[in-house]
């Protein structure tokens, strides 16, 4: 089967590997040639992923049978609508269904309309004075969000990126002046986790839970990034999540898919719920209309079933299930020094792939070109898969020793200490639970 993959980051390298394992003849379109994808694809087109017409031209030229969309920006640009008009079934939501991610105010209003469990108190403002008065009256810490896509970097939280509600009002005023509107939400305290599912518009197939490390530096400090790494456990749940929490989070995603169908926007593709586990249970922080990056790398590294068959099930409305190995995974991203604010670009990195393989680790390429030159975003990810989290983390660390160049990474991703910190956070918030082993 000829499959078009749109996107050239680490997430897409992981998707491409899984499609190739499933027997796909792979064709890729992305804005730069990912060296990992270049090796496994039959042909490679260079284009902005949001240039819908150009992507469609490549798809027609290659006569593809199926398309799989990696990143969010082309979804917002209507790439699924355009490919399906050409008769090419596509894994990914339409422009209208992708609003769950691309329009945060629409997503919150959708949750409210449909009584989706796990939702937060929110308000959308286009008037500066009204916004300030509401924040003053509310009185508790808030979260300030731009309405559109920000790559995870535009959200600011009081007590973290913002000192207090006064600073929140200043940032919200800036966003109203820039974008015309702003989303204000209650702050929810707890620990974040990622729950990804496959959906054909009706059926919802859960994947293992993953936890991401969004901050740039060790100890969860520094600017928010696209994600510096992530881990998953062999039991497919996380140490601080109870079976009841898992069921509640899954119900939120199932109710979301059901309500999307009811509203006339059947959701076909991957839905990613970014949850905050609060003392009362899981609360949805935001939806993403595609795989997470890095979280895709964790789950696809242990997918036992054929991704091509799952993709066919999604587009034909008959996805039945997905089996995953009972293994732990650790993904550590290496990023250019200075990332995310002022990254080094153009410098070369040296990667000893043979030595990495001997360590039992796996490499996933992202923002590097075919000459291993840094392009400015996260460069590559090192993946460890093992029976225990401790072993998986050691494998990823061992692989990193064979990469040279002006890059940095978070040594604490997937470590026992960092996970114990998250368990402590939940206990300090008053949540009663017995931690799962990982």
Swiss-Prot record:
It catalyses: 5-phospho-beta-D-ribosylamine + glycine + ATP = N(1)-(5-phospho-beta-D-ribosyl)glycinamide + ADP + phosphate + H(+). SUPFAM superfamilies: Glutathione synthetase ATP-binding domain-like, PreATP-grasp domain, Rudiment single hybrid motif. It comes from the Archaea. Mg(2+) 2 binds at residues 286, 288. Residues 108-316 form the ATP-grasp domain. GO terms for molecular function: ATP binding; metal ion binding; phosphoribosylamine-glycine ligase activity. Mn(2+) 1 binds at residues 274, 286. Keywords: ATP-binding, Ligase, Magnesium, Manganese, Metal-binding, Nucleotide-binding, Purine biosynthesis. ATP binds at residues 135-194. Its EC number is 6.3.4.13. Gene3D superfamilies: 3.40.50.20, ATP-grasp fold, A domain (3.30.1490.20), ATP-grasp fold, B domain (3.30.470.20), Phosphoribosylglycinamide synthetase, C-terminal domain (3.90.600.10). Mg(2+) 1 binds at residues 274, 286. InterPro entries: ATP-grasp, ATP_grasp_subdomain_1, PreATP-grasp_dom_sf, PRibGlycinamid_synth_ATP-grasp, PRibGlycinamide_synth, PRibGlycinamide_synth_C-dom, PRibGlycinamide_synth_C_sf, PRibGlycinamide_synth_CS. Mn(2+) 2 binds at residues 286, 288. GO terms for biological process: 'de novo' IMP biosynthetic process; purine nucleobase biosynthetic process. Pathway: Purine metabolism; IMP biosynthesis via de novo pathway; N(1)-(5-phospho-D-ribosyl)glycinamide from 5-phospho-alpha-D-ribose 1-diphosphate: step 2/2. Signal peptide: none annotated. PANTHER family: PHOSPHORIBOSYLAMINE--GLYCINE LIGASE (PTHR43472), PHOSPHORIBOSYLAMINE--GLYCINE LIGASE, CHLOROPLASTIC (PTHR43472:SF1). NCBIfam families: purD. This is Phosphoribosylamine--glycine ligase. The lineage of its organism: Archaea, Methanobacteriati, Methanobacteriota, Thermococci, Thermococcales.
């Amino acid at each position: 089967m000829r499959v078009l993959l749109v996107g050239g980051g680490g997430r897409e390298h992981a998707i491409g590997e899984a499609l190739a394992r499933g027997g796909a003849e792979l064709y890729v379109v992305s804005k730069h040639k990912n060296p990992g994808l270049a090796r496994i694809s039959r042909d490679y087109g260079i284009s902005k992923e949001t240039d819908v017409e150009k992507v469609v031209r490549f798809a027609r030229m290659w006569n593809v049978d199926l398309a799989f969309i990696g990143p969010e920006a082309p979804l917002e640009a209507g790439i699924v609508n355009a490919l399906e008009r050409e008769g090419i079934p596509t894994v990914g939501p339409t422009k209208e269904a992708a609003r769950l991610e691309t329009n945060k105010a629409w997503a919150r209003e959708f949750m409210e309309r449909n009584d989706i469990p796990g939702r937060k108190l929110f308000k959308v403002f286009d008037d500066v004075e009204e916004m300030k008065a509401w924040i003053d009256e509310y009185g508790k810490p808030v979260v300030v969000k731009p309405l559109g896509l920000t790559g995870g970097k535009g959200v600011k939280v009081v007590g973290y990126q913002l000192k207090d509600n006064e600073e929140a009002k200043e940032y919200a005023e800036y966003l109203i002046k820039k974008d015309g509107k702003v989303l204000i939400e209650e702050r929810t305290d707890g620990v974040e986790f990622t729950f990804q599912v496959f959906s054909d518009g009706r059926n919802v197939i859960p994947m293992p839970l993953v936890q991401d490390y969004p901050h740039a530096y060790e100890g969860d400090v520094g600017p928010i990034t696209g994600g510096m790494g992530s881990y998953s456990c062999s039991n497919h749940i996380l140490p601080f999540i109870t079976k009841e929490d898992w069921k509640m989070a899954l119900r939120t995603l199932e109710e979301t898919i059901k309500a999307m169908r009811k509203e006339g926007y059947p959701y076909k593709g991957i839905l990613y719920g970014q949850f905050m586990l609060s003392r009362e249970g899981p609360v949805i922080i935001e939806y993403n209309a595609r795989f997470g990056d890095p979280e895709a790398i964790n789950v696809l590294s242990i997918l036992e079933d054929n991704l091509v068959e799952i993709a066919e099930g999604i587009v034909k409305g008959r996805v039945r299930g997905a089996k995953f190995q009972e293994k732990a995974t650790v993904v550590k991203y290496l990023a250019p020094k200075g990332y995310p604010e002022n990254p080094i670009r153009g410098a070369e990195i040296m990667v000893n792939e043979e030595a990495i393989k001997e360590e039992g680790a796996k490499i996933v390429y992202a923002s590097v070109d075919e000459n291993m030159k840094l392009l400015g975003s996260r460069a590559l990810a090192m993946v460890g898969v093992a029976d225990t989290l401790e072993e998986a983390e050691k494998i990823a660390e061992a692989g990193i020793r064979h990469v040279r160049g002006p890059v940095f990474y978070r040594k604490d991703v997937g470590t026992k200490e960092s996970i114990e910190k998250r368990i402590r956070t939940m206990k300090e918030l008053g949540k009663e639970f017995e931690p799962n082993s990982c």
